[in-house]
Regions:
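N-terminal helix-turn-helix DNA-binding module of bacterial transcription factors
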Residues: 1-39, 312
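Conserved hydrophobic residues forming the short capping helix/wall of the S-adenosyl-L-methionine
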Residues: 20, 65, 179-180, 210, ...
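Alpha-helical recognition/docking segments in bacterial nutrient-uptake
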Residues: 33-147, 151, 211
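Hinge/beta->alpha junction and helix N-cap segments in small-molecule ligand-binding domains
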Residues: 46-56, 74-83, 109, 134-144, ...
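Periplasmic-binding protein-like
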Residues: 88, 96-103, 158-160, 213-223, ...
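Short acidic capping loops at alpha-helix termini that bridge into adjacent secondary structure
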Residues: 155-156, 187-191, 241-246
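Flexible loop/turn connectors
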Residues: 207-208, 212-312
Length: 312
């Protein structure tokens, strides 16, 4: 009756609706899910909910899932393998219909390989095998950023990253190395700084560059969040960007165009990432018999602004 059964008369329907109003009745989603064997819920595990990049992607995911009658169950792994695996397990216990995971760990560390045959899974920015996946052209994006710095005369370029393994860190690292190689510049590995994920890691890594590596003229950061921290560390010392040191970020979060100077960065297509992941998981939920797995590869775009100085 509640689903619009045509065999129920209008008179009976009105009586039931009146009784529901008097009792302040709300249809029980759990009861319906037990009958239909579905919760109409998709679990989403992101790496850092404070990062505007993830916020924008989640908005896109939620928009599409809501249009298909699904809700989002969100968890924040904080770039830790333990929390990622913990939240995946908890979501399965809560009977979500599928999972979208922004993967932060390797094949050996992740439990996705163990559960992908019992629940639909889509990974984002991941190299895990045999799952539907949404990736961006991270190697190309990083290559363009570092190549641009080199073309502006910078040869000593620091790279700030988080201290964990996943495909987008690996691919951005490949782009960093390839740009140096193609321009005939030998890489000094001390310029690659990594840190555990903390609110101040970018600030501390930038101070290490400024204290220990005075020859560095540019910093490339794994994401714009780290670039924001680098700005703060540099400006707290009374130094100027880009006159004293240049910065290039990654993601093109909304804040990037509001920073002073505006941040040169690599843009990721946040809306398309979220929409693609949501479409893949709904397709997989509705037809779990599919044997082939799909990888969506989306392009990045290099955005030139005011944070890089030509020092040739």
């Amino acid at each position: 009756m509640f689903n619009g059964n045509p065999s129920v008369s209008k008179k009976t329907k009105r009586k039931v609706e009146k009784a529901m109003e008097e009792l302040n009745y709300i249809p029980n989603a759990l009861a319906r899910s037990l009958v239909n064997k579905t919760s109409n819920t998709i679990g989403v595990v992101v790496s850092d909910i404070t990062n505007p990049f993830f916020t924008e992607v989640i908005e896109s995911i939620e928009e599409y899932l809501n249009s298909q009658g699904f809700t989002v169950f969100l968890s924040n792994s904080r770039y830790t393998v333990e929390k990622e695996n913990q939240y995946i397990s908890q979501m399965i216990e809560k009977r979500v219909d599928g999972l979208i995971v922004f993967n932060t760990c390797t094949e050996e560390e992740s439990i996705i390989g163990k559960i992908k045959n019992i629940i639909p899974v889509v990974t984002v920015q991941s190299a895990l095998k045999e799952t539907d996946c949404v990736n961006t052209s991270d190697e190309t994006g990083a290559y363009r950023a570092v190549d641009y710095l080199i073309k502006q005369g910078h040869k000593n370029i620091a790279f700030l990253v988080y201290n964990f393994e996943n495909s987008n860190i690996s691919n951005r690292m490949k782009g960093y190395f390839k740009a140096h190689k193609d321009n005939g510049i030998e890489i000094n590995k001390k310029y690659i700084l990594s840190s555990d994920f903390t609110p101040y890691c970018g600030y501390h890594m930038t101070n290490m560059v400024l204290d220990k590596m005075p020859e560095v003229t540019a910093i490339f950061t794994y994401n714009d969040q780290l670039a924001v921290s680098a700005y703060y560390a540099i400006q707290m010392r009374g130094l100027r960007i880009p006159d004293d040191i240049s910065i290039v970020g990654y993601d093109n979060i909304g804040l990037a165009s509001l920073m002073r100077p505006t941040l040169t960065t690599v843009e990721q297509p946040t809306y398309e990432i979220g929409r693609s992941a949501a479409e893949l998981i709904i397709s997989r939920v509705r037809d779990q018999r599919k044997s082939t797995h799909h990888t969506v590869l989306l392009p990045t775009k290099f955005i030139v602004r005011d944070s890089v100085k030509n020092i040739k």
